Amino acid sequence: MKTIQLVLAASLVLAVPAFCQQHGGSRPSGGAPHNSIPARGPAPVKATPHPVEPNRNYSDQPGHPNVPHVDGKTWVGHDTGKDDPRYHIDHPFAHGQFTGGFGRGHVWRLGGGGPGRFWFNGWYWDVAAADIAFCDGWLWDSDQIVIYPDPDHPGWYLAYNVRLGTYVHVEYLGM
């Protein structure tokens, strides 16, 4: 009888730490695995820029979202060039430049807010007015994003949503 009690006690002692560990939930559907996060942002537009259209269709293939997104190495929708008036800022980097790190090695979890003002890790941002509709499905208190410099629009960065595979133009507001 003592042997059974000893085995049960030992099993309990060994099992308790396993139950105390936090288990991550399953990846939300539509999420991109970490290795599909783009290694770098888009290249500057060198070809004839795509004209700005009020109701542009970004769904380049069946099943792709109708918002700017990344398909492999292609930044679908980042093709309007440097003269796109929607992304003109009179005083680029008025709040300083973001120095927290760019690309797949720097994944940030959103801490709250919304398109008008959101934050992560003590840094504050806002979404470009032209892009607010593109972040409709973002979870502002939990989604992971990656920041990239925008090579065509001074003062703007691109925030890539890891879960959705989509991106929007964002402005750094400082700490």
What are these regions (language model features)?
Residues M1-Y87:
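Extracytoplasmic low-complexity, disordered linker/stalk tracts in cell-surface/secreted proteins
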Residues N55-M175:
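Low-complexity segments
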